[in-house]
């Protein structure tokens, strides 16, 4: 689960920039969203895209994150984390029930846990900048709830809305989609390049993504050489403490 923190004062400008790039995307590729997995694999609407254009799209979103200083919060749930942090997870599950997340499967439970922990991590971060800061609203890709559904979470004694929407209708979500893709792609590039030289496209991708490493606020991400990618080594205990 990946979330992005955008200052309320920047929302309108960010929307204008995203809509401009989305209109270009529609004109060039007849696509409504930036699907970076498809872009890099030359699939679906992006079947005919060349490497330069693919890198340009990655650069666009990296520059958006830098320009608006968008902070990125990540949360992954694993069986080991659940075993080691039973009390924490029990508390998170209680919050999930208060939010109305009636999860049937374990996967749905973990999705709601990741969402709530992400929100709590985001709250902790914005309050660390200034005691006056707060989470104004949360927008989440449809999954736990259908498009246009909403619920609330209590933060600091206040009810904060969680609105569920599609990334096609709510373009801000595409920034979070990109941030999630960037993290996954970095790990994949690392795995593929063990003991061998990274391919040119992957190396250029890593060089672009290296610039947004500091924006991931709750992982320790260090790149001493773009050719070797990003090393993520902060533990779950460090993230939640």
PLM segments and residue spans:
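Phosphate-ester processing/binding pockets and catalytic centers
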Residues: 1-241
């Amino acid at each position: 689960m990946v979330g992005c923190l955008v200052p309320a004062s920047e929302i309108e400008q960010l929307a204008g920039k995203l809509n401009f790039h989305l209109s270009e995307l529609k004109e060039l590729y007849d696509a409504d969203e930036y699907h970076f997995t498809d872009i890099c694999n030359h699939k679906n609407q992006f079947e005919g895209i060349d490497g330069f254009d693919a890198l340009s799209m990655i650069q666009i979103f990296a520059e958006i994150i830098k320009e608006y200083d968008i902070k990125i919060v990540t949360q992954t749930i694993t069986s080991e984390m659940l075993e080691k942090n039973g009390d924490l997870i029990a508390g998170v599950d209680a919050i999930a029930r208060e939010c109305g997340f009636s999860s049937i499967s374990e996967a749905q439970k973990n999705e709601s846990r990741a969402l709530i922990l992400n929100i709590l991590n985001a709250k902790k971060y914005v309050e660390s900048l200034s005691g006056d800061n707060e989470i104004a609203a949360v927008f989440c890709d449809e999954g736990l709830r259908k498009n246009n559904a909403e619920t609330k979470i209590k933060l600091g004694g206040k009810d904060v809305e969680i609105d569920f929407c599609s990334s096609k209708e709510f373009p801000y979500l595409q920034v979070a989609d990109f941030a999630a893709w960037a993290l996954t792609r970095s790990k994949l590039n690392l795995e593929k390049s063990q003991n061998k030289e990274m391919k040119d496209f992957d190396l250029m991708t890593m060089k672009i993504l290296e610039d947004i490493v500091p924006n991931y606020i709750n992982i320790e991400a260090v790149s001493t050489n773009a050719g070797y990618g990003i090393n993520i080594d902060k533990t779950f205990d460090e993230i939640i403490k």
